[in-house]
Amino acid sequence: MSSRESASRRPDPLRVTIMQSPSAFSLTIGGHGVATSDYLPVLNPATRQPIGQCPVASEEHVEQARAAAGDAFAVWRQVPYGKRCEQLQALAGILEAHLDELAQLLTHEQGKPLADARGELAGAIAFCQCAGSLPLPEVVHEQSATRLSKTVREPLGVVVAIVPWNYPVSIAFVKPDRRVGCRKHADSQAGADHAADYLRIGELIRDALPAGVINVLAGNDDLGPWLTGHADVAKISFTGSSVTGRHVARSAAADLKRLTLELGGNDAAVVMADSLSDAVVERVFWSAFTNAGQICMATKRLYIHESIYEAFRDKLVAYAQNVVIGDGSQPGVTMGPLQNAKQFAKVMSLIDAVRQRGGRLIECGQMRGGDGYFLPITFVDLPDESAPEVVEEAFGPLLPLLKFRDVDEVIERVNAARTGWLAASGVVIGRSAHGLQQPSTRSVWSTTGCDHAVYSFGGMKASGYGAESGLEGLLEFTTQKTVIIQQQ
């Protein structure tokens, strides 16, 4: 079978070979491992074979976790802030000590190449270290011999953190763990497809923090509503699709819970006329196709200046032809499969729509995949601005290539998206100041990326609200308290 035939073949989601006795993971509630009566298989997307069994939490488990978190909060909030930071730093040490094991498990359950899995673990470690070193701001308004007034920050209480399948480990640790958390590791669509690594981390950190400070749950579609609708939850931090985010927001509104939503994006990169270089081509390529394009802040629309369009496109295609697509655990593979059958079907439907209307598809890459959810790197050459692959977030290895003439025009087209995550610009920084801050997005990058844990990020418009990471992300998990003391 040719690589092209292999790339175009749709895997049958019903044809799954069951391995002998895959290991079962357990929930973490109140510092203890908890088994369940029901389990779902965790599939390796490169082979579609089980690598383990995911426990399915019941409503009773949710109540147990909520009670454990509430009891822990009463004690944990009294621990000095500096001591809490030290314990968070200790989590980074645990991740470092088990990095190889966790990276291999992450590759097997998520699909990304092993080097990228190690990078995700390194990111989680950096987030722990960063959050464990951030000072909580305290503002003194008035201080005299007779009067003191100040504003301090205190932890909110029990938090539900909902983690997605594309970066389940790093995003889990973006959500500051120094606050008491009822941590849920399950997507409201299919929690079993990404729970293994974080369930394993839950097992590793049970003795690192007081019982109940972090509880790790996984399950099916029922788990999300049970957690987000619970009256004793003070805050929800959700990372996932805009569609599910709206459901979470409605659930939070019933009790006026604090809410952070990090949702989908249809991010654009802009390549100016002075950027026809191999370095820019490589940078733009990986901004779109890292993790097979399954990143909220990945480039999903590429605007290229008309004067270099054909030359830049051809360089991009030539670079893509050398990318090896296959099982991320194998040497030499630099791009893995789609993570699950649902996402595979979504991207295939967008590609099929281009074919049906007679659009030009350019398929690239060296396919070494088997029965997994593999797709070739696919460019759409000059689609209409209203085409589905331009308007919708593909969240896969599909990238529309578009022309533009001037900066004002392209900024208007970038801003036409309903989402507002990121705008990236492949231009020389010294010549890009004009217009750089005009995109209606929460982040703008110019020939660089978000490469430090201290930076905060988030969305606007349909990409959500609130902040993750950095000081701004930390403050999302706190509430202000103004203290006024009249001294005698």
From Swiss-Prot:
Keywords: NAD, Oxidoreductase
GO molecular function: aldehyde dehydrogenase (NAD+) activity
Pfam family, one: Aldedh
Family recorded in the similarity comment: Belongs to the aldehyde dehydrogenase family.
Encoding gene per record: terPE
Catalytic reaction list: an aldehyde + NAD(+) + H2O = a carboxylate + NADH + 2 H(+)
EC number of the protein: 1.2.1.3
Residues reported in the UniProt entry to bind NAD(+): 240-245
Functional summary from the UniProt entry: Involved in an alpha-terpineol oxidation system.
Biological source species: Pseudomonas sp
Membrane-spanning intervals of the chain: none
UniProt cross-references to SUPFAM superfamilies, sorted A to Z: ALDH-like
Name this protein carries in UniProt: Probable aldehyde dehydrogenase
Residue positions of the active site: 262, 296
